[in-house]
Amino acid sequence: MMKDILQEIVDHKKVEVKRFKEALPESDIHLRVEQDMALTPEKRPSMSRAIMDSDSGIIAEFKRKSPSAGWINRDAKVEEVTNAYQHNGASALSILTDSDFFGGSDKFVSEAIASGVTLPVLYKNFVVDEYQL
């Protein structure tokens, strides 16, 4: 069962990446990243350093659903949950961004940061192509 769902996710992600490549060439992505970095030059803290220096060592995860359990909380607000994790002692955050299988979104990471989260953030997705990096 687990192998089947993993293969299904990978196959789906390959199709999704192909569509993204057609809609947004890699050269455009590089330009956007350069522009974003110029606007926000501050660096996120190191995840390993944050974990080693913390009392908890906890990487708290934001996930709306899972392939095995279905919807956990369809209406969870990334800003509220991640700030609550930060306030309650998490060392770092893991944010699921896959939409179809985990109910995530790429924008969840920027929304968490814009809401005041200062912890290191792990962008969690299935990477099947260099284009995604």
Question: Residue ranges of each PLM-predicted region?
Answer:
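Alpha-helix-loop-beta-strand connector modules within alpha/beta enzyme cores
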Residues: 41-59, 103-128
